[in-house]
């Protein structure tokens, strides 16, 4: 058996999931000078806003037809009090700073709802403070709605775009401050649960969307999981890849015995230089399961 080590597999191939668990809400904010030069405000790790007032939510879950990017962006936008037309999404790299980047079992909303809500809410608070300062009014007399900070006593307002154009926001929230933010109640939602245009549809229609099969980096290999007989308890006790070695481009086999999600026992992956090579190798490899 041509076995590939865990380290070699992760270093030498593209990864569809991140294997570092946990996340931090501690801000990844640019300095005032960097913010001006880059024309953007990085609030927390998963949200960036620019001087047009556009909010880009960084999605670290995989889009598989369920429009997860739109759903996660709705959570941020709800507390941010921003117009839906001012919201975008993107899919960042697989750097470990993003935490566990796995998608499945309806985890995405469950695991990130509170986090995304507090990201949006803290950004709203920072914008209200900056907007009140621009209008020379008390921040406690202001509220945010539809991409604007409004002074309750005079109805005077400044848009998020104006605020981000004229101010450099360096507001940092501690973990304690984030946890103390009062979030909206179910009956107060105006974005969550509403039928809104999906943010990823235009790219899918015009052909610019990048799918997993489109990904390519030099020297990458393709992997094909060999199904196990049962989800729990199945362990490979012998892997015979003699026939797979006859397939052009076959690289080896990776046996995973430490699933980071803890929802599967272990699995075997056939590796090859091409997609179809991996498909053929997976069928040729014989696995004896316990």
What are these regions (language model features)?
Residues 2-23, 33-290:
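Cofactor-binding beta-sheet edge motifs in enzyme active sites
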